[in-house]
């Protein structure tokens, strides 16, 4: 869960997430053939879903299995060949569609499994980047790095102050004397793929391109509040002004927090 820093991770800003005590658990067996067999205890009605490591591509009817398949595809794209099939059983206690990164959890878990099965030399940070790459390129969701990073790099009783532009980070102890963090579920299902997420990112990227015509920046996260107010007239659409303003001001709020 992110404590502060919303819509900043894909704008080169800072985020302040922490990992949760709930997650996704899996049992995997490497096969001698090319067959993939997936089963989720959370979606028992779907039964065993079969695929192959050969010619991996997203399939709408496959639903959740696109996440582990995407990570397998991403490993291959990064030069780490997944040569054998797999039987994969998953169980998760993250409320599905609640905005608590269940898909990123599946991605990172799949990365852990592949690293273990094949002996790939990849760090936890690399696994986070591979998970993001798979979600961007295989599943078509232009997410930032925050969810996968928090899951792969989370530390007990700590949050992570992460600069998404440089990937520099530090752990910040969370010791709340006499207080608790409460996460509530509204029961409104949420998925990045069918939300306005990609649209928001496109709007921010368009605003950045307009600002880059008048000031030398790499991302919206490079701007101070004062700089934004000085140069915001370069953004031609009022909606894009709102999107960019949020990214800039939220980034500064995160730094102060």
Describe each PLM feature range.
Residues 1-100, 104, 108-124, 129-133, ...:
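ATP-binding N-lobe of GHMP and related small-molecule kinases
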Residues 9, 150, 253-254:
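Hydrophobic side chains within alpha-helical segments
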